[in-house]
């Protein structure tokens, strides 16, 4: 009972408005594009301490419209999309059994650093399965995060094996748990957001490459901007309700823009010539594999949809290509140029642009 009370309190806890966040445009753009198209593959946010990483991630989750689920379902199953529902609900749908529906806020799940594999994936009661022949599954954090956002702070300190599991589930949209020959599978489609401080160590390149985007954020140096950030935070801490009310109009406008972009996304086209140039940039940067090409195409379409366009242009690509490729470049200790600057330089050369 006490746990239930605690959860209810957390649900009504005021969240700093996304539209009130000053600066950090790169991080905000990466999060919005992943929300518009979760197939981009999540975002890794690396930056200094105290730069608003956690605040921004919680704010984007709070901004999103409510989702329709099967009532009291442990996996946030979609009531009609079979790719987003559990086997039990799929069976009920196929047999014409009436399914009760409900609306909830987009799930925002925090993965603690000390989490075990069982806590993340869920557990099967082997004893009950063997003695009674009943599959009893205790869902983990991946089930809770289905159709939502899974946030891992200090992901660079997380066990590599767990990072692998998260990335596999995020890419496939499913979580499979196998114990002693017994297998349980459930939908686990979520936006994976990792954050960390580069001073505390980097992720292995093989794992970093699996993140769709990589945003780098730095402490704001402009004194006027710093004052504005401090004022915004102070106003929110003193009177959260008033701060949220002041931002309500901008929040509603952005929420609608994201919802419209999600609907428009499937109709967006990108010319063959532009696709060739994207691959040319990846080739000249010596990017391993094809993930860079695929993610850049998806991100450019999501950006075009966000702006209400029907087709992708070179300006759209310029806004997303650094986010999609900077973490895929091979590390050269003798290279003085920042990886982001290198991507921009090659992009301008391939697209015959001096500056965007």
Curated annotation (Swiss-Prot):
Pfam families linked to this entry: AAA_lid_2, Mg_chelatase
Molecular function, one GO term: magnesium chelatase activity
Protein name as catalogued: Magnesium-chelatase subunit ChlI
Stated family: Belongs to the Mg-chelatase subunits D/I family.
Main location: plastid
E.C. designation(s): 6.6.1.1
Gene Ontology biological process terms from the UniProt entry: chlorophyll biosynthetic process; photosynthesis
Pathway of action: Porphyrin-containing compound metabolism; chlorophyll biosynthesis
Catalytic activity, as annotated: protoporphyrin IX + Mg(2+) + ATP + H2O = Mg-protoporphyrin IX + ADP + phosphate + 3 H(+)
Binding site for ATP: 47-54
Protein function: Involved in chlorophyll biosynthesis; introduces a magnesium ion into protoporphyrin IX to yield Mg-protoporphyrin IX.
Intracellular or extracellular location(s): Plastid, Chloroplast
Origin: domain of life: Eukaryota
GO annotations of cellular component type: chloroplast
Broad class of enzyme this protein falls into: ligase
Alphabetical UniProt keywords: ATP-binding, Chlorophyll biosynthesis, Chloroplast, Ligase, Nucleotide-binding, Photosynthesis, Plastid
SUPFAM superfamilies to which the protein is assigned, alphabetical: P-loop containing nucleoside triphosphate hydrolases
Regions that span the bilayer: none
